[in-house]
């Protein structure tokens, strides 16, 4: 989730004063810094970074900036683009703006704008969307096109992967869960996450750790770190898990994973 976004608005001194007054009325004004430069104003929005699969835990700087720009008397194309983009993805993280909000027993869809830029007269917007295991890429693409095409928008790039999902009752998950529960005392069921892990590259694999319940999620953050105590606790759990998997009596011709 981007923690910074900026825009330069070409304007004269009279227009600069008007924009400064409008910023004072914006509810997120404390997150936007306005600087006078030759030929106009530079706006820098500051948010709070978060993992792409957890947009609700961050403050998206792009959404803050779009929220301000949509109410400005900009050139027609820019004003309309800011308004439409904010309507589609600036107000929520669950896809309601694009009408793709959905959820199943393993989790809900998340969505966040991660890039927006004006170049060669074209405004590009990049979205990060993580969808539930009960949906697929074809469903997602069809629903997005249904919404954006009547607005005059085009889908110029599409890059995605189907969910990687292993059933909670599979032998692999149950073996790992048993080890974790014995070592931690935490009896909660396993969970599915929106993050893409290296497990996706291995057919018979799942992500296992390393964050314990209640701990702050520091991956991909400016202060990413892990304590020695946590590493030692993890090592104990991982060693027990490897031992359990290596000594499991797996059926001769049966995959340890039931997809």
Give the positions of each predicted feature:
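An extended, acidic, His-containing surface patch that forms the Zn2+-binding/catalytic region
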Residues: 46-49, 53-112, 117-120, 130-135, ...
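Hydrophobic residues embedded in beta-strands of well-ordered beta-sheets
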Residues: 41-43, 121-125
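Residue-level signal for inorganic ion chemistry
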Residues: 9, 65, 127
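A generic structural signal for short, solvent-exposed coil/turn residues
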Residues: 1, 24-26, 35-37, 105, ...
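Short glycine/proline-enriched coil/turn segments at helix->beta-strand junctions
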Residues: 11-14, 28, 39, 73-75, ...
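Short amphipathic alpha-helices in soluble, non-transmembrane regions
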Residues: 17-29, 57-61, 68-71, 139-149
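Extended amphipathic alpha-helical segments enriched in small hydrophobics
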Residues: 3-6, 126, 138
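Histidine/acidic-residue-rich, glycine-tolerant segments that coordinate divalent metal ions
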Residues: 1-58, 257-258
């Amino acid at each position: 989730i981007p923690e910074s976004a900026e825009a330069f608005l070409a304007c004269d001194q009279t227009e600069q004063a008007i924009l400064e007054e409008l910023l004072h009325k914006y509810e997120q004004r404390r997150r936007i810094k306005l600087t006078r430069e030759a030929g106009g104003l530079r706006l820098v929005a500051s948010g709070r970074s978060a993992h792409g699969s957890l947009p609700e835990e961050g403050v998206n700087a792009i959404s803050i900036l779009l929220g301000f720009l949509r109410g400005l008397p900009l050139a027609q194309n820019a004003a309309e683009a800011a308004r439409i983009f904010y309507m589609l993805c600036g107000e929520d993280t669950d896809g309601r703006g694009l009408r793709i909000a959905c959820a199943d027993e393993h989790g809900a869809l998340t969505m966040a704008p991660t890039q927006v830029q004006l170049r060669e007269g074209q405004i590009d917007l990049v979205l990060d969307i993580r969808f539930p295991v009960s949906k697929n890429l074809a469903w997602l693409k069809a629903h997005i096109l249904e919404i954006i095409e009547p607005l005059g928008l085009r889908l110029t790039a599409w890059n995605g992967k189907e969910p990687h999902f292993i059933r909670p009752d599979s032998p692999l998950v149950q073996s790992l869960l048993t080890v974790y529960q014995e070592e931690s005392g935490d009896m909660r069921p396993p969970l599915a996450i929106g993050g893409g892990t290296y497990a996706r590259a291995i057919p018979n694999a799942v992500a296992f750790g390393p964050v314990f319940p209640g701990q702050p999620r520091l991956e991909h953050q400016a202060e990413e770190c892990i304590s020695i105590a946590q590493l030692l606790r993890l090592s104990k759990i991982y060693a027990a898990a490897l031992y359990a998997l290596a000594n499991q009596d797996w059926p001769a011709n049966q995959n340890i994973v039931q997809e």
